[in-house]
Amino acid sequence: MAPSAASGVSSLPSGFAVFTTFPDLLFIFEFVFGGLVWILVSSSHVPIPLIQGWVMFASVFCFVATTVLAFLYVIGAHGNRTSWITLDAAYHCVASLFYFGASVLEALAAIQLQDGFLYKYYHENISAVVFSYVATLLYVVHAVFSLIRWKSS
């Protein structure tokens, strides 16, 4: 067992150090870009409700879960337990998969909006696709570095 795991010392930050350490700094950007996806998808024209429903579910779920997780880190709820490192890695892996699926489906919806709809709706969906892929990239990077932290704990 690694020395840090044996002694119960966690490498997770608490307090406002969450916003100054990597990869936890990415919480801010995940929050911003996830919120943009949520806003753009909810305000855009819905050509296929089932696809847009999954995109909304994924973006709202990740937005709320990221907010709650960041808040719990700030208040120090992890209490230096290593199980929170596992939770962090697992959540970001799941969020990466959710957002990747949502990004692909949102791109499909935008492609189908190309003909026969107002240009405004097409631009809103294209913006949602771009921000969704940015959010996916942020979650993937956070997941990779969380897995590295988990492996070394």
UniProtKB/Swiss-Prot annotation:
<feature type="transmembrane region" description="Helical">
    <location>
        <begin position="25"/>
        <end position="46"/>
    </location>
</feature>
<keyword id="KW-0449">Lipoprotein</keyword>
<feature type="topological domain" description="Extracellular">
    <location>
        <begin position="115"/>
        <end position="125"/>
    </location>
</feature>
<feature type="topological domain" description="Cytoplasmic">
    <location>
        <begin position="148"/>
        <end position="153"/>
    </location>
</feature>
<dbReference type="InterPro" id="IPR050578">
    <property type="entry name" value="MARVEL-CKLF_proteins"/>
</dbReference>
<keyword id="KW-1133">Transmembrane helix</keyword>
<dbReference type="InterPro" id="IPR008253">
    <property type="entry name" value="Marvel"/>
</dbReference>
<dbReference type="GO" id="GO:0019911">
    <property type="term" value="F:structural constituent of myelin sheath"/>
</dbReference>
<comment type="subunit">
    <text>Interacts with PLP1.</text>
</comment>
<dbReference type="InterPro" id="IPR013295">
    <property type="entry name" value="MAL"/>
</dbReference>
<comment type="similarity">
    <text>Belongs to the MAL family.</text>
</comment>
<comment type="function">
    <text>May be involved in vesicular trafficking from the Golgi apparatus to the cell membrane. Plays a role in the maintenance of the myelin sheath, and in axon-glia and glia-glia interactions.</text>
</comment>
<dbReference type="GO" id="GO:0005886">
    <property type="term" value="C:plasma membrane"/>
</dbReference>
<feature type="topological domain" description="Cytoplasmic">
    <location>
        <begin position="76"/>
        <end position="92"/>
    </location>
</feature>
<keyword id="KW-0472">Membrane</keyword>
<dbReference type="GO" id="GO:0098737">
    <property type="term" value="P:protein insertion into plasma membrane"/>
</dbReference>
<dbReference type="Pfam" id="PF01284">
    <property type="entry name" value="MARVEL"/>
</dbReference>
<feature type="domain" description="MARVEL">
    <location>
        <begin position="18"/>
        <end position="151"/>
    </location>
</feature>
<feature type="topological domain" description="Extracellular">
    <location>
        <begin position="47"/>
        <end position="53"/>
    </location>
</feature>
<feature type="transmembrane region" description="Helical">
    <location>
        <begin position="126"/>
        <end position="147"/>
    </location>
</feature>
<feature type="topological domain" description="Cytoplasmic">
    <location>
        <begin position="1"/>
        <end position="24"/>
    </location>
</feature>
<keyword id="KW-0812">Transmembrane</keyword>
<dbReference type="GO" id="GO:0042552">
    <property type="term" value="P:myelination"/>
</dbReference>
<feature type="transmembrane region" description="Helical">
    <location>
        <begin position="93"/>
        <end position="114"/>
    </location>
</feature>
<protein>
    <recommendedName>
        <fullName>Myelin and lymphocyte protein</fullName>
    </recommendedName>
</protein>
<dbReference type="GO" id="GO:0016020">
    <property type="term" value="C:membrane"/>
</dbReference>
<feature type="transmembrane region" description="Helical">
    <location>
        <begin position="54"/>
        <end position="75"/>
    </location>
</feature>
<keyword id="KW-1003">Cell membrane</keyword>
